[in-house]
């Protein structure tokens, strides 16, 4: 019998969600995927975690919980860093115009919190988390 190959769960970095929203995100993701979800709150801890870990996906809230600043600023910093620029990033927002703006900055098309549990959202995440 061939040795069993251990499959490592994918890592997701969730940025800028308050405690209750982070909990909802973790439940949604772990229900649908074998993944570990870490939390960051702003640019400094986000970049530090990304440089120290291997993340399959970064989910950035459109408005950060710590100071209500624009999450697209973190997206810009990730995409400007040669070591991180290929890391897939999605903006979490229910507003199509903000999804469009994030895509123009190099993000993958994200989803909003109202879309948790939607089969289309799960399908969108599969290419990063399966």
Model regions and ranges:
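Short acidic, S/G/P-rich loop/turn micro-motifs used as interaction or catalytic elements
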Residues: 18-22, 63-68, 96, 116
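A short, hydrophobic beta-strand element within the central beta-sheet of small alpha/beta folds
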Residues: 85-96
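C-terminal output helix
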Residues: 115-125
């Amino acid at each position: 019998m061939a040795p069993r190959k251990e499959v490592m769960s994918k890592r997701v970095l969730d940025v800028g969600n308050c405690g209750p929203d982070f909990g909802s995100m973790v439940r949604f993701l772990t229900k649908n995927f074998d993944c570990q979800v870490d939390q960051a709150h702003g640019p400094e801890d986000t970049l530090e975690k990304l440089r120290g870990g291997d993340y399959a996906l970064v989910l950035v809230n459109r408005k950060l919980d710590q100071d209500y600043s624009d999450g697209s600023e973190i997206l810009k910093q990730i995409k400007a860093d040669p070591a991180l620029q290929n890391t897939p990033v999605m903006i979490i927002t229910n507003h199509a115009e903000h999804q469009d703006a994030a895509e123009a900055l190099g993000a993958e098309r994200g989803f909003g919190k109202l879309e948790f549990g939607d089969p289309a959202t799960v399908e969108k995440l599969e290419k990063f988390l399966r």
